[in-house]
Amino acid sequence: MELLSTPHSIEINNITCDSFRISWAMEDSDLERVTHYFIDLNKKENKNSNKFKHRDVPTKLVAKAVPLPMTVRGHWFLSPRTEYSVAVQTAVKQSDGEYLVSGWSETVEFCTGDYAKEHLAQLQEKAEQIAGRMLRFSVFYRNHHKEYFQHARTHCGNMLQPYLKDNSGSHGSPTSGMLHGVFFSCNTEFNTGQPPQDSPYGRWRFQIPAQRLFNPSTNLYFADFYCMYTAYHYAILVLAPKGSLGDRFCRDRLPLLDIACNKFLTCSVEDGELVFRHAQDLILEIIYTEPVDLSLGTLGEISGHQLMSLSTADAKKDPSCKTCNISVGR
């Protein structure tokens, strides 16, 4: 049988967190003959792994020939925000069950995307199922070392400046390494209604009245839901003043929440005053997208311990947790 030509001119497009479309060129004489495609897909760090031989049990992707471009989809082998290399080989399955194969194409590299809004909406729905009842609170707070606040006063005009969010949480979160903001907490102790006296982030705490950051002029977005191999679950929310740079970033990427009616964090008017509530059964991580003036709040030392084991800095999400994972790239 006549040999097959080697595929060439690979093109990758329509990339998502767990899929991509691929096409390539081959000789016209092969179009009617080819019955299967072999696709060698590797994470970039493994791009030098040996390609499988057609006589072996395939360890890569095998697909029946379809018109190109074709979509490759699968959360079990594609992760978001991950660099991959891909090469293709065409084949004709013969009557004896063996394959006549082409040479391998050139290798092309690409990077998968972030979670889309519909994926985040699925995470949001899962988070809502365990959020629990709503508790009142009155302040947002941020713990850090004393030197951090001294630096803000001395070198930053008494302002807490936004910084780039780390890679904690879901690997596919569009905020990781992209959104600038200042991290705050709002959870309270059940028995006192006050912020806890322990913190993993430092013994000095800045507290600011909730209405300074959260009010009808603020948009609220859902950003992530994750855990760190423990029973605790975390939800990341973004507070962005309407029309701000942070608001424009979130608008196209994150689900927008109704500030007066959602399962995580609310601001509503009761008896002419703003009232704030947070979900009892989630640890909320709040990202405020603008600089925060220290003069708008108070700074003091907490009486409890610095519980480093609870820090979420660059924390990796447990990919096996059924509570906070969805069936797309993780």
UniProtKB/Swiss-Prot annotation:
One Gene Ontology term from the biological process aspect of the record: protein localization
Protein purpose: Its interaction with PHYH suggests a role in the development of the central system.
GO molecular function: protein tyrosine kinase binding
Gene Ontology CC terms: cytoplasm
Organism, scientific name: Homo sapiens (Human)
This protein's name: Phytanoyl-CoA hydroxylase-interacting protein
Positions bearing carbohydrate: N14, N325
Matches recorded under InterPro entries: FN3_dom, FN3_sf, Ig-like_fold, PHYHIP/PHYHIPL, PHYIP/PHIPL_C
Gene name linked to the record: PHYHIP
Matching Gene3D superfamilies: Immunoglobulins (2.60.40.10)
